[in-house]
Amino acid sequence: MRKNKYSNIESIIKIAKKGGMYILVDDENRENEGDIVFCASDVSPKKINFMAKNGRGLICLTLNNNQAKKLTLNYMSPVNQSRNQTAFTVSIEAKKGISTGISAKDRSRTIKIATKKNVKKNEIVSPGHVFPIIAKDGGVLVRAGHTEASIDIAKLSKKIPAAVICEIMNEDGTMSKGDDLFKFANTHKLKIAKIDDLIAYRFKKEKLVKLKKKSSIHVKG
């Protein structure tokens, strides 16, 4: 039996690059919850069905501000009073190529359309069965949420800045935390990483980039 051990961010990036799923856990003093995550560019009916069947939480599409503007998405509420200021927009659906919109196939298509680089706003309608969330510019260095973390991983994996996330619930309807999360991860052979580690990873990497840029500047005497 595997020990309850968090994976490093490098291993999560490798999984994301290969189109795989993984779990991100936020701080104990925040939601203290785990989300199943994969890059939106790798969406498939199979992955959506896995989330719906095993994750049991709300399946959401995380987007950056730029993509949300292309879709002219309005916030779900003009005044965000949610505890963690999660930036939900109106729900969406692909205008064409779907049936009722709720099937794994339909939701997968909606996500594919909504994350196209050249998407037109009339390709998406509201309301629908996919729930977009807009990430803060600056990612986890600005807001340590699953929304920002999922997009940061996508960007670090050299993929479009969008992801699909779903909270993990236990069979009894309670939120999966701690040992329950590791049990879930072990059962489904998924790796778990902490958002706190992603924050540290970004600080370290971006500091090194700045130092390299600084050292490349030659001052003439």
Describe the function of each predicted region.
Residues 1-221:
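Catalytic domains of riboflavin
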